[in-house]
A protein has these predicted regions:
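Non-heme di-metal
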Residues: 1-191
Length: 191
């Protein structure tokens, strides 16, 4: 691959690296807030997504050749809200990445002759699209009050001990391990 030094693609990679790095930290903070509010599953999803953002940042960082590069970019700053607010902000950020930023960066990379970089921007955009979808689904559950209560019987699983319960809502306390409702999720059999 030709040198990235001094190209717009180098600046775009550095911008993406900074954005992914900051998203990782914001999601880590949002995970703490979700746990405080009693949403253990959502906290774990924020943490999992933070780890995925770290991997995206690492992938971008490996393209960089060292030295200094100046970029101008805007990032969300300074506010960790409620879990609902954090989910909404996260979904909007993910939409921006996959919907415009990364496609634009891929186009520039192609124009400058960096096909491998363009493909990475496009591949990471696929993950960001799924992140947005998941955050919007979780937000809908929080807003509707259906994180721990559904309109029909479902199977609930205690994330702490594995206890299974069938009903319209998760138990207030797990009868097996005595952990609070916050540790229950709808059972997902995705193997």
């Amino acid at each position: 691959m030709p040198s990235l030094k001094g190209t717009q693609t180098e600046k775009n990679i550095l911008t993406a690296f900074a954005g992914e790095s900051q998203a990782r930290n914001r999601y880590t903070y949002a995970a703490t807030k979700a746990r405080e509010e009693g949403y253990v599953q959502i906290a774990d999803i924020f943490s999992e997504t933070a780890d995925q953002e770290r991997e995206h940042a690492k992938r971008f960082f490996r393209f960089l050749e060292g030295g200094e590069a100046e970029v101008r970019a805007c990032f969300p700053a300074g506010v960790i809200g409620t879990t609902a607010e954090n989910l909404k902000q996260a979904a909007e950020g993910e939409l921006y990445e996959w919907g415009s930023m990364y496609p634009d960066f891929a186009k520039t990379a192609r124009e400058e002759g960096f096909e491998a970089v363009a493909k990475v921007f496009e591949a990471i955009a696929v993950a960001e699209k799924q992140h947005e979808k998941r955050y919007r689904g979780l937000l809908a559950n929080v807003e509707a009050g259906t994180v721990f209560k559904k309109s029909k019987k479902v199977v609930w699983r205690c994330r702490n001990c594995g206890y299974i319960h069938e009903g319209e809502e998760a138990p207030a306390v797990c009868p097996a391990c005595a952990h609070p409702r916050a540790h229950f999720e709808v059972l997902a059999e995705n193997w």
